[in-house]
């Protein structure tokens, strides 16, 4: 019997570098599992859209959607879960995080950035209004504390508190930076380069690490999620339901984003404690939501 098709579903981004990094993750997955049919899909910003990919799968072939996202949120609980339920023989795995191996990647990024034991670390996630997303970031912070002796403060780009700029500001008096002084370092808990990663540079930390990708460990985690969901009686993601929507995280996906909701929610400017929101979010997110509404209620 053939293995189920893997739908490696990312959020989507307008960043060419971020898109290349996510495509590299899919390539790593395929290289680690020769013969596995790995399909590309997105829930926003990029094509092919997850709904279209699912509709185009061979009839009768089982499939597992693996969210290339770092925590639960609107897209995992609603968009992805609905896509899995809407096709016979399909399921959805849990997202990539939290996982101790993500802390290993963050530890490597901090070492690459020259972090020392005297520095404070702001663990910067995208953010979500779903409380489970913040819980998963706190869990990841505990994994990172087990690897490093630094003071580690979780913070968020949007939708949750503290914001990344606020966390940096609160640590600055204690960690002034400069030669011989403890610094404030942002550990980018974001999947790839994109809008939110670029915004981290505006938070006035001394150093910002690179995002999680590229890393082969990410492909190993994705395959573990796939295997758990594909196994008989496997550990699939929870059912869809009324879920809070998230601030638009573009490709980074730590608390993955819903662009349409983000575009209508008031956002603080960076100087008052929140990262700016991407300009591309509103049109793409709106038209995707409108298309789904029309498909559901006015089928051809």
Q: What residue ranges belong to the model's regions?
A:
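Active-site-proximal alpha-helix that buttresses catalytic centers in soluble enzyme cores
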Residues: 1-300
């Amino acid at each position: 019997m053939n293995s189920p098709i893997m739908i490696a579903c990312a959020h989507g981004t307008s960043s060419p570098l971020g898109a290349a990094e996510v495509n590299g993750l899919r390539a790593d997955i395929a290289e680690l599992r020769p013969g596995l049919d790995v399909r590309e899909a997105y829930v926003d910003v990029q094509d092919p859209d997850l709904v279209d990919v699912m509709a185009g799968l061979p009839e009768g072939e089982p499939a597992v959607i693996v969210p290339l996202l770092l925590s639960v949120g609107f897209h995992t609980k609603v968009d992805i879960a609905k896509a899995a339920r809407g096709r016979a023989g399909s399921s959805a795995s849990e997202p990539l995080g939290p996982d101790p191996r993500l802390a290993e990647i963050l530890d490597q990024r901090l070492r690459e950035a020259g972090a020392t034991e005297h520095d404070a670390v702001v663990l910067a996630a995208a953010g979500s209004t779903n409380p489970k997303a913040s819980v998963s970031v706190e869990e990841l912070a505990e994994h990172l504390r087990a690897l490093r002796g630094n003071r580690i403060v979780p913070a968020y780009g949007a939708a949750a508190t503290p914001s990344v700029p606020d966390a940096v500001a609160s640590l600055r008096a204690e960690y002034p930076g400069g030669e011989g002084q403890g610094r404030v370092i942002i550990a980018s808990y974001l999947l790839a380069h994109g809008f939110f990663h670029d915004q981290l540079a505006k938070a006035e930390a001394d150093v910002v690490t690179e995002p999680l990708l590229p890393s082969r460990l990410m492909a190993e985690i994705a395959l573990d999620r796939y295997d758990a969901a594909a196994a008989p009686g496997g550990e699939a993601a929870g059912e869809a339901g009324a879920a809070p929507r998230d601030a638009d995280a573009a490709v980074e996906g730590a608390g993955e984003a819903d662009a349409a909701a983000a575009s209508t929610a008031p956002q603080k400017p960076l100087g008052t404690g929140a990262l700016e929101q991407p300009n591309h979010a509103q049109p793409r997110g709106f038209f995707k939501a409108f298309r789904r509404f029309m498909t559901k209620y006015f089928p051809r």
